[in-house]
C-alpha cells in the first residue's frame, strides 16, 4: 500500500514538475517578448526623432522657397505694372500731340 501511495506521490511530483517546467518556459518566452518589444519601441522612438528633425528641416526649407517665389512674383507684377504704365503714358502723349509722330 505504501508503494501505491508512494507511486501516486511520485506521479503527482512529476506532474507538478512538468507543470512548473511548462510555466517556466512560458515565462521565459514572455520575458523574451517583452525585451523584444522594448527594443522595437526604442527603434520606433529613434525613427520618430529622425522624422521630427527631418520635418522641421522640410518646413524651414519650404518656407524659404515659398518666400523666394513670392518675392519673384511681386517683382514680376511690379515690372508688368511699370511697363503698362509706360505704354499708357506713351499712348496718352501721342493722343494729345505732345509727342509728334
Swiss-Prot record:
Annotated site (Interaction with STX8): 33
Cysteines joined through disulfide linkages: none
Residues bearing the modification Phosphothreonine: 28, 48, 54
Membrane topology: Single-pass type IV membrane protein
Membrane-side (Cytoplasmic) residue stretches: 1-75
Subcellular location: Lysosome membrane; Late endosome membrane; Early endosome membrane; Cell membrane
Transmembrane segments: 76-96
List of residues that carry Phosphoserine: 5, 18, 55
Principal subcellular localization: membrane
Tissue: Expressed abundantly in the kidney, less in the liver, brain, kidney, heart, lung, pancreas and placenta.
Subunit annotation: Forms a SNARE complex composed of VAMP8, SNAP29 and STX17 involved in fusion of autophagosome with lysosome. Found in a number of SNARE complexes with NAPA, SNAP23, SNAP25, STX1A, STX4, STX7, STX8 and VTI1B. Interacts with PICALM. SNARE complex formation and binding by PICALM are mutually exclusive processes for VAMP8. Interacts with SBF2/MTMR13. Interacts with RAB21 (in GTP-bound form) in response to starvation; the interaction probably regulates VAMP8 endolysosomal trafficking. Interacts with STX17; this interaction is increased in the absence of TMEM39A. Interacts with TRIM6.
Family per similarity comment: Belongs to the synaptobrevin family.
Listed name of the protein: Vesicle-associated membrane protein 8
Organism: Mus musculus (Mouse)
Name of the gene this protein is made from: Vamp8
